[in-house]
Amino acid sequence: MTTGPHSPRARSGPSWRFLAEVLALAALGVSAVSGCGATPVAGSGARPSTPVIRASLATSIETSAGSWATVAMGHLDQPLNTFWQLLFRPPGAALWSDRASALAVATNGGLVVATHSGRSLAIGIRPTNHLDYSPLIVTSDARSWLPAGPIGALADEPDALALAAGGEAMALVSDGRVTRVLASPGGLASWRQIATEDGLATSAAGRSCGLVSLLAVGYAAGQGLIGAGCSRDGIVGIFASRRSAWRLVGPRLPQSLGNSSAEVLGLQTTTRGLCALVGVTVRRSTKVVAACTSGNGLKWRVSPALSLAGPQHLVSFGPAGDLGLFVMISGSAHRDILAVLGEPDVSWRTLPSPPARTAVVVFGPAGRLDALAVDGTSFTDWLLAGGDRWKKVQEFHVAIQFGSSG
């Protein structure tokens, strides 16, 4: 576990008695979930399903309680010595605090966060070491932390968890062999299986895009959506359920991208609708585009492409307040590329390159923009003070107990 100079006391988190109960019930809960819905098709691990573009779990999100961000710290080349932190800053406050200790669960596997309209934050803790399930915890004020029912292992994808306005939720889970989509009718207490990777791939909708992997879940106008990777040229794999059947509702890529396959990296709710971040493979090059809706319909507009050249990779992405969506791409000479997708024109605008080692940026209230940089156990908050000047406003070290998860 980790602590920091602004960490709340441990009693603010779920009790260890609760965690013992979770451990005792996890096998039963996961088994019950596995038994619900359709039976997975055998051999689901046979198809290649590794995304071409890997998206980090690092992200930021706004709720009524304040600003949140998830970052990995420690020895990032050692999975059991990588510890994910949950950073929080209340409205009007100048400093961040580390709330990872409130989760009271080892965070080596990563954190997946979700909200709807900023009312509350749901945190899913990906399994690590010998665990094979994901605890879920919900907070609306960063002080009270309510445990929800554990589910199967959340997939290693940024948008593996999604919440809807009515309290419904979707989750993407994977045991390394079978990838499934689960749904909760409300409260995150009970889950049922609504789709599997193999089941969707062999359906008429899945075959029409050449589905190879499930990568994200989300909601648009209250309708649950699944984002996928597809092998057929120019088809973006976004699926919606209608009358107990899944249908392909994603857009086609513009002809300017030529013969290209696409994978949905994320499904992000914006103030205007939904934006899907899509990785595109064109011959030997990779690009990123966004496909966005507005209003209650699923009429898509596709953005121009951002190119990932050579060793460049996707550092992080997330909501950018009223602006829409941000994407950060690694650059040369420690100068990463930060781009914001504007709505409704669906075009990219480049912002000043964030400082070195920035893991994620945070679009806060009143136009505030922070870059959160990490280096081992060191955390630094940089504020865009005007023009292209970043100003250091906070720095602290997180006390990490290396070797505690091995």
Where are these regions (language model features)?
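Structural motif
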Residues: 78-85, 129-136, 177-182, 233-239, ...
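Bacterial signal peptide processing site
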Residues: 37-39
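Entry beta-strands of beta-propeller and related beta-repeat scaffolds
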Residues: 64-71, 118-123, 167-172, 221-227, ...
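Repeated scaffold domains used in trafficking and secretory/extracellular systems
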Residues: 54-62, 105-115, 153-165, 202-219, ...
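Short loop/turn motifs that cap or connect beta-strands within the blades
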Residues: 48, 99-105, 148-154, 194-205, ...
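C-terminal motif of bacterial Sec signal peptides marking the signal peptidase cleavage site
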Residues: 33-35
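Conserved Ser/Thr-centered positions that define the repeating blades of beta-propeller domains
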Residues: 89-90, 138-140, 184-185, 240-243, ...
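Beta-strand-rich domains and repeat architectures in extracellular enzymes and scaffolds
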Residues: 48-84, 107-112
